Amino acid sequence: MDPKSQRVKFNDGHFIPVLGFGTYAPEEVPKSEALEATKFAIEVGFRHVDSAHLYQNEEQVGQAIRSKIADGTVKREDIFYTSKLWCNSLQPELVRPALEKSLQNLQLDYVDLYIIHSPVSLKPGNKFVPKDESGKLIFDSVDLCHTWEALEKCKDAGLTKSIGVSNFNHKQLEKILNKPGLKYKPVCNQVECHPYLNQSKLLEFCKSHDIVLVAYAALGAQLLSEWVNSNNPVLLEDPVLCAIAKKHKQTPALVALRYQVQRGVVVLAKSFNKKRIKENMQVFDFELTPEDMKAIDGLNRNTRYYDFQQGIGHPEYPFSEEY
């Protein structure tokens, strides 16, 4: 990590800010909140914004970015913006149109990072979550290597600066890395990662291949969305985390974010609350000791909040593997 600019270098030479602003919110949250929160995040210093076609807020997020460029707060090149290819567009011929649709919604010329949202391909069409009469997901069958080739073409066309994946296990990453004629390696793998699911083996694997691990749900998951397993314990109430926070006069959330930064993980902080958005920027103002890091490592219990159980049974369901 380059501490001065707080950025990490990708294997393709581009840089990603280590702290990102997450924009996912449950459907009942008005989209206008994404607009206001993203503007505020940029005002207080966030330079990395993470969204996705699935979140259905790219118009608002794009508007926020453009308004902060228009008022002189930032230039386009100061902002690192990530979008994601949703599961119903993994067929190679659907990849570029999906990215172009995101760009159209954003009203931007390019994204900085475009990633495959999940390896679980779903039936193409206008439904994000296509289901049959019995309510089961309708799967599609796609060779992810072919999807990857379509992403490589998007990079060559200048629609995205970098390309990566999300929710891939190490075997799925290996499949891409070992692909004959591979032009570009994935720059990152964005996965759920927090002290209860610290992904140490996947992190080690990614580091050995010069792939950056990006953490979502870094504070656990408070959202009662259809993707969340709600029987899990609340991460931010963990006594060890709370004790370390108290010692440093920080919040448990900041300790959880700082933990990732010190492991070389790029971390997304999702909040639409102005006080917390501002607070999350303080992750660079303190340092955890080696003892703190070891204690937090010891909290791992392989608890997955986003286990995407509807995807079980798909040949590419990623979470049956250990990592």
Curated annotation (Swiss-Prot):
Annotated signal sequence range: none
Binding site for NADP(+): 20-24, 50, 166-167, 190, 216-221, 270-280
Subcellular locations according to the entry: Cytoplasm
Organism domain of life: Eukaryota
PROSITE patterns: ALDOKETO_REDUCTASE_1, ALDOKETO_REDUCTASE_2, ALDOKETO_REDUCTASE_3
Disulfide bridge partners, by residue number: none
Catalytic activity field: prostaglandin F2alpha + NADP(+) = prostaglandin D2 + NADPH + H(+)
Residues annotated as catalytic: Y55 (proton donor)
CDD domains named among the record's database cross-references: AKR_AKR1C1-35 (cd19108)
Keywords of this entry: Cytoplasm, Fatty acid biosynthesis, Fatty acid metabolism, Lipid biosynthesis, Lipid metabolism, NADP, Oxidoreductase, Prostaglandin biosynthesis, Prostaglandin metabolism
GO cellular component, one term: cytosol
Predominant localisation class: cytoplasm
One BP term from GO: steroid metabolic process
Pathway this chain belongs to: Lipid metabolism; prostaglandin biosynthesis
Keyword Cytoplasm: yes
Molecular function in Gene Ontology: aldose reductase (NADPH) activity; ketosteroid monooxygenase activity; prostaglandin F synthase activity; steroid dehydrogenase activity
UniProt-annotated binding residues for substrate: H117
Enzyme Commission number: 1.1.1.188
PANTHER family registered for this protein in UniProt: ALDO/KETO REDUCTASE
Function, in words: Catalyzes the reduction of PGD(2) and PGH(2) to PGF(2 alpha) and a stereoisomer, respectively. It has a broad substrate specificity and also reduces other carbonyl compounds.
Protein name in the entry: Prostaglandin F synthase 2
Source organism phylogeny: Eukaryota, Metazoa, Chordata, Craniata, Vertebrata
